[in-house]
A protein has these predicted regions:
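Residue-level marker of regulatory loop/turn positions in helix-turn-helix DNA-binding domains and
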Residues: 34, 82, 90, 125, ...
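Acidic/histidine-rich, surface-exposed loop or edge segments in extracytoplasmic proteins
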Residues: 15-27
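Short, surface-exposed loop or secondary-structure junction motifs
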Residues: 74, 128-277
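Short, well-structured active-site flanking segments
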Residues: 77, 85, 97, 103-122, ...
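Short, low-complexity N-terminal intrinsically disordered segments enriched in polar/charged residues
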Residues: 25-30, 256
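Short, conserved catalytic-motif segment at the N-terminal edge
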Residues: 29-88, 112-115
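Bacterial Sec-dependent N-terminal signal peptides
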Residues: 1-14
Length: 277
């Protein structure tokens, strides 16, 4: 389906940026008006950035006040978006989920994040400097980021096998001296957790974080297309939507490999903000 046809079906008239931001949002004093204005922004973003779908869940004091899906999870079949059931690749939003899990494991005494990674993963090739699990979680260890097409890998690898993608590379800097955001830090964090607890990382996350928080629609991305998952699209030179190439993100589960819904991610956010979990 062409992008033009898709958005003609979604919206009767195109919106301009001037129309969207004409109103002073500080003067909005009702939920209904706030949602109306927000929907203008959402619709503009859908058109401007050629986004097939958006799933939104907003809560206030722990209760949902706005849940809605826009666009289609499957364009050709016109499958609507359900905020509580439609799965998306949440990419690096997997990191705070791993962070919650690491904190829970630290509280339970299964791991000490101030210890060297090598206390838990002694088979990781030695580097010029030692570094701790905590430094990995804070992106302070000097591990490199993706190279080339590593982000598009489409073969199943376990978390342990996955560290082979970067294990032979040197550190970028002495740990603790610089900040460098990357996903491979969390490959090592999740592997350290797995070795410390002597059970699969995803099992621990499920039983100690997902289930207690009621995140029943959050799963590891095992490759392919899972039931209820929104189809990942890209656009070609002819402005046509087409399905992206398959990838398998399981090897980087802790840093960018979970599937989830808007509602579940909202539950995680509440747990982080509430500081009670």
């Amino acid at each position: 389906m062409s992008i033009i046809t898709f958005f003609q079906q979604l919206f009767a008239q195109p919106l301009t940026q001037k129309q969207i931001f004409a109103e002073d949002v500080s003067k909005i004093n009702s939920l209904e008006k706030a949602i109306q204005q927000s929907e203008l922004v959402v619709n503009y973003l859908l058109q401007e950035h050629y986004t097939p779908s958006i799933s939104i869940c907003v809560t206030k004091r722990g209760f949902p006040i706005w849940e809605h899906g826009y666009g289609y999870a499957d364009i050709e079949q016109k499958v609507p978006v359900n905020t509580r059931e439609t799965l998306y690749r949440i990419a690096s939003v997997s990191k705070p989920l791993t962070g919650l899990s690491l904190t829970k494991m630290q509280e339970q005494g299964w791991i000490d994040w101030n210890c060297s990674l090598y206390d838990y993963v002694p088979y990781f090739p030695k580097k010029e400097y030692d570094f701790t699990v905590k430094q990995l979680a804070g992106h302070l260890a000097g591990i490199r980021a993706y190279k080339g097409k590593e982000v598009l890998l489409n073969r199943f690898m376990s978390i342990k096998e996955g560290i082979g993608v970067f294990s032979q590379d040197p550190l970028l800097f002495e740990p603790g001296t610089q900040y460098y955001y990357n996903s491979y830090d969390f490959n090592l964090v999740s592997l350290a957790m797995q070795e410390a607890k002597k059970e699969p990382f995803e099992w621990y996350v499920t039983h100690n974080v997902l289930e207690p928080l009621g995140m029943y629609h959050t799963f590891p991305d095992m490759g392919g297309l899972s039931p209820n998952q929104s189809i990942p699209y890209m656009t070609d030179k002819k402005k046509q939507f087409k399905r992206t190439s398959d990838v398998n993100n399981f090897f980087k589960l802790g840093g960018g490999g979970f599937l989830s819904t808007a509602y579940d991610v909202n539950l995680m956010g509440q747990a982080i903000l509430g500081k009670a979990f």
